[in-house]
């Protein structure tokens, strides 16, 4: 029997590929307004602090290839062809959907590399993808979230358990887990956006699976705008928890992200570590999902569930 061909649109935020991309990339994020020279220099210094340009572009490509391979190996009903579409740099979502149409794709599934749904992020990705798909006559079914997937929860719980195993007994007895995601403007909550609740649910499931005693939910990497953003920020939270509970070790799990990139390698591994050093506490962070086989298997399960429920 001939396999049914299905397009798989893997969407992500995107990241500069080289230093020259930094200005146009952030100009796109700022809706066409260039960052001022001081802000641009600050961004360049952040990238330099993590060893140059973020590894995110390469990891996104590796994740997409691994996911396509896993999907096609796991079943013989569909032939999946994966494409990458990015929000703020080429290949842009719209250009990728156009490429899918040129390749003769009639049906496709889209997946954002972010576990939690929000009107601010996942909804905007799916809107851009669906509008373009409609234009080209592609039936596109979008995955909205996957924050409670058992494999996703288990991946983080296993990493946390391994981290606790590395600690001294004193650290283990005086430690706290901080579960975080990218902060978003507080105004999203007024419209009933589920983002905050979904992160809290992820944290609860991970804590149960890993059998963690002390934990807190925090937010990170907020944008530089006048609007209030979701808090507490992970750095402030670290100080508050140290002052109120005297913890000797902090374990950071930025579960809203799926790869090593600037927000993790700088905002966690540099900024949070600086706070830990200041207060005399130990800093720990389990590995990110990247292309870990268990994580890729989880994404494949998410896509297959959507395929079985939606594909004609």
Curated annotation (Swiss-Prot):
What are the subcellular locations of this protein? Answer: Cytoplasm
Tell me the residue numbers annotated for binding Fe-coproporphyrin III: 13, 30, 46-47, 54, 125
Among the entry's GO cellular component annotations, what is one?
Answer: cytoplasm
- The EC number(s) attached to this protein equal 4.99.1.9
Q: InterPro entries this protein is in?
A: Ferrochelatase, Ferrochelatase_AS, Ferrochelatase_C, Ferrochelatase_N
Which HAMAP family does the annotation name? Ferrochelatase
Q: Which PANTHER family match?
A: FERROCHELATASE (PTHR11108), FERROCHELATASE, MITOCHONDRIAL (PTHR11108:SF1)
**Name under which the protein is recorded:** Coproporphyrin III ferrochelatase
Annotated source species:
Oceanobacillus iheyensis (strain DSM 14371 / CIP 107618 / JCM 11309 / KCTC 3954 / HTE831)
């Amino acid at each position: 029997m001939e396999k049914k061909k299905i397009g798989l649109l893997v969407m992500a935020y995107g990241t500069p590929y080289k230093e020259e991309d930094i200005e146009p990339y952030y100009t796109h994020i700022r809706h066409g307004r260039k960052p001022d020279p001081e802000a641009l220099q600050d961004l360049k210094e952040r990238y330099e602090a993590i060893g140059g340009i973020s590894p995110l572009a390469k990891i996104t490509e590796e994740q997409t290839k691994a996911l396509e391979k896993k999907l096609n190996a796991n079943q013989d009903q569909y032939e999946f062809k994966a494409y990458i579409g990015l929000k703020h740099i080429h290949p842009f979502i719209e250009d990728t959907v156009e490429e899918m149409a040129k390749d003769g794709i009639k049906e496709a599934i889209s997946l954002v590399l972010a576990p939690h749904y929000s009107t601010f992020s996942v909804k905007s990705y799916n809107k851009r993808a669906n509008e373009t798909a409609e234009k080209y006559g592609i039936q596109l079914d979008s995955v909205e979230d996957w924050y409670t997937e058992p494999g996703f929860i288990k991946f983080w719980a296993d990493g946390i358990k391994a981290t606790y195993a590395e600690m001294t007994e004193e650290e283990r007895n005086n430690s706290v887990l901080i579960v975080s995601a990218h902060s978003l403007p507080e105004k999203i909550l007024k419209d009933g956006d589920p983002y905050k609740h979904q992160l809290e649910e992820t944290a609860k499931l991970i804590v149960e699976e890993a059998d963690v005693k002390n934990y807190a939910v925090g937010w990170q990497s907020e944008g530089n705008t006048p609007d209030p953003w979701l808090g507490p920020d992970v750095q402030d939270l670290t100080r508050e928890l140290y002052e109120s509970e005297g913890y000797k070790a902090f374990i950071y799990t930025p579960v809203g992200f799926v790869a090593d990139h600037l927000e993790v390698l700088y905002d966690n591994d540099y900024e949070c570590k600086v706070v830990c050093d200041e207060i005399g506490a130990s800093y720990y962070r389990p590995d990110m999902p990247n292309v870990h086989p268990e994580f890729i298997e989880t994404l494949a399960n998410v896509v297959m569930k959507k395929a079985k429920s939606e594909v004609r």
